[in-house]
């Protein structure tokens, strides 16, 4: 599932920042409403939009299908245009 997230459409998913070099972004939550090569745009619960830089954060993404699944993903893996992520081979940042 975690490798499939890199090929998944992020717009419409709920997302939370769990780690970031910008401490003011940690715990920011919202729904992804737009994605560019280097950023994600979230709509927070109060209706405000916030732009997040992918490279400096780790995100907790929530999927809702038969049951709720939450996955933490390093933003560096998400850098790139959404359509190009489908074509790109996945580099492993961490060895498990």
Curated annotation (Swiss-Prot):
Native species of this protein? Answer: Methanococcus maripaludis (strain DSM 14266 / JCM 13030 / NBRC 101832 / S2 / LL)
Q: Which UniProt keywords apply?
A: Cytoplasm, Endonuclease, Hydrolase, Nuclease, tRNA processing
Supply one GO BP term: tRNA 5'-leader removal
Q: Does the keyword Translocase apply?
A: no
User: Where does it localize?
Assistant: Cytoplasm
EC category name: hydrolase
Family (UniProt): Belongs to the eukaryotic/archaeal RNase P protein component 1 family.
Q: Which InterPro entries does the protein's record reference?
A: RNase_P/MRP_Rpp29_sf, RNP1, Rof/RNase_P-like, Rpp29/RNP1
Q: Which reaction does it catalyse?
A: Endonucleolytic cleavage of RNA, removing 5'-extranucleotides from tRNA precursor
Q: How does activity depend on temperature?
A: Optimum temperature is 36-38 degrees Celsius in the absence of L7Ae, 48-50 degrees Celsius in presence of L7Ae.
Against SUPFAM superfamilies, the record matches this protein to:
Rof/RNase P subunit-like (SSF101744)
* GO-annotated cellular components: cytoplasm; ribonuclease P complex
**What is the annotated role of this protein in its UniProt record?**
Part of ribonuclease P, a protein complex that generates mature tRNA molecules by cleaving their 5'-ends.
Q: How does it assemble?
A: Consists of a catalytic RNA component and at least 5 protein subunits.
Pfam families per the record? Answer: RNase_P-MRP_p29
Task: Provide the protein name.
Answer: Ribonuclease P protein component 1
Q: Has the keyword Cytoplasm been applied to this entry? A: yes
